[in-house]
Amino acid sequence: MVKPNRSVLRSKNMLRKAYIELSTEKDASKITVVDVVNRANLSRNTFYAHYPDVNTIAEEIENEFIQKFNLYLDQTLF
């Protein structure tokens, strides 16, 4: 298994954090790529190197949350 590059992980984390922050301020359907990259202080090229669109970053965040929540439930209930 190949480990992801540290700069890739850092960029993706910055983009995800920016999206989460923005989602607390405005409706998710109104968040744009420009909003995310401005908040993350990264370029649009960096965004598109990792995600095809804003919906994909939202889905990734949701899927990770669900996965972690299910793991938590498994550990606490069984």
Name each region found by the language model.
Residues 13-21, 39, 56-76:
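Alpha-helical structural segments
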Residues 1, 44, 76-78:
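Primarily secretory-pathway and cell-envelope proteins
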Residues 1-22, 26:
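Basic, helix-initiating cap at the start of DNA-binding domains
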Residues 22-55:
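Helix-turn-helix
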